A protein has these predicted regions:
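Midchain, well-structured core segments that form catalytic/ion-binding scaffolds
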Residues: 1-89
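Generic secondary-structure signature for well-ordered alpha-helical cores
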Residues: 23-31, 103, 107, 135, ...
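Zn-dependent metallopeptidase/amidohydrolase metal-coordination segment
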Residues: 73, 133, 140-220
């Protein structure tokens, strides 16, 4: 079952499962099995435990390291890894660890890009303002939270990330899946799944909330 790089808990990587199976295949030579053993060992745990890069950030929680693509090109196996990490680990430190752990198995990292994590200042009044607007519109008081997702707010001097994952009955889509609000069974309808869902009435309600957020942000930032 696939998952999202920002929250991979409960997901299963198909490539890692295939690599683990092929490691037991006597028809493959020792060199090929060693290559596949690295995939099995380093990719199975989406939180970096297998490759030794596991890290807990006080703001964002556990580092996640998700493999998205595997391919053979020019006779070599190539992988892509999407690693999400917080503000307490410098990017150069993580790069050094990645080069060391993969290099120890004979792998090279021809492309290694990173950027520092984005987060809203702990003293900013904006998250509480967004929470208050959502509480007023839905009648449900929820805390703000941090997640390891990519955001264009990273490029904006006064950018703040907020989403549209509300159902018409006021529950978040995560709360609503499998309930009376949305009739999807567990494991279906979630983000980036083949049957990803969006509650239309909830979407329009969220647009109204975001309009209020934009106006309130403008007032906070210019007064």
């Amino acid at each position: 079952m696939g998952g999202h790089a920002s929250c991979p808990q409960g997901s299963v990587n198909a490539g890692a499962k295939a690599a683990a199976l092929l490691c037991e295949c006597d028809a493959l030579n020792e060199s090929d099995r060693a290559i596949l053993a690295t995939v099995r060992d380093y990719v199975t745990d989406p939180f970096g435990g297998g490759s030794g890069i596991a890290h807990e950030d006080p703001r964002f929680g556990r580092l996640s390291a998700a493999n998205g693509l595997m391919e053979t090109k020019d006779g070599k196996l190539r992988l892509s890894m999407d690693t999400r990490y917080g503000t307490s680990m410098p990017s150069e430190e993580l790069k050094a660890k990645l080069r060391t752990v993969w290099g120890s198995r004979g792998w090279s990292l021809p492309s290694l890009e990173s950027r520092e994590a984005f987060h809203v200042d702990d003293n900013s009044p904006v998250p509480e303002m967004i929470r208050a607007i959502c509480t007023e519109m839905t009648g449900v008081d929820r805390p703000c939270f941090r997640m390891s997702g990519g955001t264009y707010s990273h490029y904006l001097p006064n950018g703040f990330s907020c989403g549209v994952s509300l159902s018409a009955k006021g529950a978040t889509l995560g709360e609503a899946v499998g309930s009376d609000a949305l009739s999807f069974p567990e494991g279906h309808g979630g983000v980036h799944q083949p049957d990803e869902s969006l509650d239309i009435e909830g979407f329009f309600s969220a647009m109204q909330a975001i309009a209020h957020v934009v106006l309130q942000c403008d007032e906070l930032l210019h007064n």
